[in-house]
Amino acid sequence: MIFQRTVKEMVKTTGVGLHSGNKVTLTIKPAPVNTGIKLVRTDLSPAVEIPAVADQVRETTMCTALVNDDGVRISTIEHLFAALAGLGIDNAVIEVDAPEIPIMDGSASPFVFLLQSVGIQEQSAAKKYIKITKPIRVEDGDKWAELKPFKGFRVDFAIDFNHPEIARSQQHMVMDFSSSAFIKDISRARTFGFMRDIEYLRANNLALGGSMENAVVLDEYRVLNPDGLRYEDEFVKHKILDAFGDLYVAGHAIVGEFCAFKTGHALNNQLVRAMLAQQDAWEIVSFEKEADAPVSFSVPAGAVFA
């Protein structure tokens, strides 16, 4: 049987909030089977819990933010959620002492390292997957995103930026998902932004913590980071990373194909909401044998059962 997963023990790190510029402490704790991913604001009294579900995503400007009915928010969840999805972690409690997840280096790689360093524990209940049975599509002008039936999890993603450096890179990628492929090919891709936008963002109290330490920065012609890019196609790979994280608020790993053109956080969330609303387009499945599982998650080293 393919089992649910959590972290073996509590792990903690600190970083900077991308938009606030303030120090943030992030704590990840184990959780029982069928808990899902829960986020908690520990800087509030009493602490406020926000479930990581699609209808709690109420802000998608520059990041994905969960916001409850009282306006309490936790922003910039997408890179952490990509790491959780990529490592197949079903259950965890995420605590932060600020309104956003720390940006770290702008990719999912520090979160992958954090989760792998503390260890991943298989649990005693079957892992649940969302199996797509009919196509679901959302559009916004020339942008679109779609989920289609497929035996594994495949991403077919294209971007279209009118910038010479991005235009020179590969702007279309197709990949079949596995934990190893995610860690090797996607997790290190950093968020990117343009110098021309920084003044506007900071005037609106956004990207106050942004720097070349946690983003790829471009002027009108080139990448400004002294060390350049981590991948030749880092731009499209980061958009895929964002999509991994955004789709994980569906609650489970998806068995299907995700196809997208120029999509971002808003359209990704619209797609998840459209899928959940179209209940005849998917079903919850589990797999008795690992060989039958269409989505390949690396078996945790020294896995134990809880």
From Swiss-Prot:
It comes from the Bacteria. InterPro entries: Ribosomal_Su5_D2-typ_SF (IPR020568), UDP-acyl_GlcNac_deAcase (IPR004463), UDP-acyl_GlcNac_deAcase_C (IPR011334), UDP-acyl_N-AcGlcN_deAcase_N (IPR015870). This is UDP-3-O-acyl-N-acetylglucosamine deacetylase. The gene is lpxC. Belongs to the LpxC family. Zn(2+) binds at residues 79, 238, 242. Catalyzes the hydrolysis of UDP-3-O-myristoyl-N-acetylglucosamine to form UDP-3-O-myristoylglucosamine and acetate, the committed step in lipid A biosynthesis. The keyword Zinc applies. One of its GO terms (biological process) is lipid A biosynthetic process. One of its GO terms (molecular function) is UDP-3-O-acyl-N-acetylglucosamine deacetylase activity. The active site is at residue 265. Disulfide bonds: none annotated. Its cofactor is Zn(2+). Keywords: Hydrolase, Lipid A biosynthesis, Lipid biosynthesis, Lipid metabolism, Metal-binding, Zinc. Pathway: Glycolipid biosynthesis; lipid IV(A) biosynthesis; lipid IV(A) from (3R)-3-hydroxytetradecanoyl-[acyl-carrier-protein] and UDP-N-acetyl-alpha-D-glucosamine: step 2/6. Its EC number is 3.5.1.108. It catalyses: a UDP-3-O-[(3R)-3-hydroxyacyl]-N-acetyl-alpha-D-glucosamine + H2O = a UDP-3-O-[(3R)-3-hydroxyacyl]-alpha-D-glucosamine + acetate. NCBIfam families: lpxC (TIGR00325). One of its GO terms (cellular component) is membrane. It comes from Shewanella halifaxensis (strain HAW-EB4). It is an enzyme of class 3 (hydrolase).
